[in-house]
Amino acid sequence: MSIILGIDPGSRVTGYGVIRQTGRHLEYLGSGAIRTQVEDLPTRLKRIYAGVTEIITQFQPDMFAIEQVFMAKNADSALKLGQARGTAIVAAVNHDLPVFEYAARLVKQTVVGIGSADKVQVQEMVTRILKLSDKPQADAADALAIAITHAHSIQHSLHIANSVKMTETQEKMTALLKTRYSRGRFRLKI
């Protein structure tokens, strides 16, 4: 069982979503947004840090997943987004959480099935996947989608690890059978 905190960073609105993963089952724990309406960037970053810290304290996540920075046309916006993202990551690291990063395109591909999905499609699929009665707001839905992507990544990694173990076991059994067969201990009947 793992509790995953997903973050959709922004210098004015930072979405968050928290889910619990038990095997393949995902359970919604909470979501929302940290809103920073002040004009001063350092004060906004301080509020993001305090907000993420409060969420970590409240939900006690085991893992922290965040969207990677994309290349924006406006350099100033990209820099502010990077600073907001870095602030959230520092809050996670200060609470000894492992940090995982996912590209927006991968998140959309995982949750919707299309890497170019729009926000409405992401909201709809998050609502379905987590069996929510109401659609979460856009920034919270994006954060939940990031958490869902991380949960799927964990499941995929476990599946691969189990496949590798099975393959290694099969190879060992095959080698053992070949050894016994070559020594005359086994006879194959056809």
From Swiss-Prot:
Gene3D superfamilies listed in its UniProt record: Ribonuclease H-like superfamily/Ribonuclease H (3.30.420.10)
Segment forming the signal sequence: none
Positions with a binding annotation for Mg(2+) 1: 8, 139
Catalytic activity: Endonucleolytic cleavage at a junction such as a reciprocal single-stranded crossover between two homologous DNA duplexes (Holliday junction)
Top-rank EC class of the record's enzyme: hydrolase
CDD domains the record matches: RuvC (cd16962)
GO BP: DNA recombination; DNA repair
Active site, per annotation: 8, 67, 139
Keywords, alphabetical: Cytoplasm, DNA damage, DNA recombination, DNA repair, DNA-binding, Endonuclease, Hydrolase, Magnesium, Metal-binding, Nuclease
GO cellular component: cytoplasm; Holliday junction resolvase complex
GO molecular function: crossover junction DNA endonuclease activity; DNA binding; magnesium ion binding
Co-factor(s): Mg(2+)
Binding site for Mg(2+) 2: 67
This enzyme's EC code(s): 3.1.21.10
Free-text cofactor note: Binds 2 Mg(2+) ion per subunit.
Keyword Nuclease: yes
Localization in the cell: Cytoplasm
Subunit-structure text: Homodimer which binds Holliday junction (HJ) DNA. The HJ becomes 2-fold symmetrical on binding to RuvC with unstacked arms; it has a different conformation from HJ DNA in complex with RuvA. In the full resolvosome a probable DNA-RuvA(4)-RuvB(12)-RuvC(2) complex forms which resolves the HJ.
Job description of the protein: The RuvA-RuvB-RuvC complex processes Holliday junction (HJ) DNA during genetic recombination and DNA repair. Endonuclease that resolves HJ intermediates. Cleaves cruciform DNA by making single-stranded nicks across the HJ at symmetrical positions within the homologous arms, yielding a 5'-phosphate and a 3'-hydroxyl group; requires a central core of homology in the junction. The consensus cleavage sequence is 5'-(A/T)TT(C/G)-3'. Cleavage occurs on the 3'-side of the TT dinucleotide at the point of strand exchange.
Similarity field: Belongs to the RuvC family.
Name of the featured protein: Crossover junction endodeoxyribonuclease RuvC
Classification lineage: Bacteria, Pseudomonadati, Pseudomonadota, Gammaproteobacteria, Pasteurellales
Gene encoding the protein: ruvC
